[in-house]
């Protein structure tokens, strides 16, 4: 198991908002989000296709940090993994928004949610890791929508989980 050094969660620049990674400023003043292959270009105040990344102050910010759309303790066998802690439990969670638009998505109500106020506010990375440990889970799963759009949140949650000896898995579209 890979061990990470203790990491302080990244600073919030506004409620549930952190500066995004993988951003480029374009010559015309727009910013480009390079988190996923869509490479959304945005002007100030515009949101990308995923709806959780937007242009603010000349950079892309992630607006769903610490806001999860659901939690569930699942058997690990429910995930697309092979022989990963067989018989164990995993704490699954996701956020709102998605970089895809699949009409057959079983999580459409979550992945295309625009009502952030219905999402929980009590879901900071350390809280998630602590909840997984209390529930007896061996791992935490980033799922329900493509976690690439909330990579900063997933990364910080992974650090918190690993500090507690928990593994992490990402269920992605790719």
Label each PLM-derived region with a short phrase.
Residues 55-174:
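Conserved Radical SAM active-site core
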Residues 1-88:
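Flexible, acidic/Gly-rich N-terminal and inter-domain linker regions that tether
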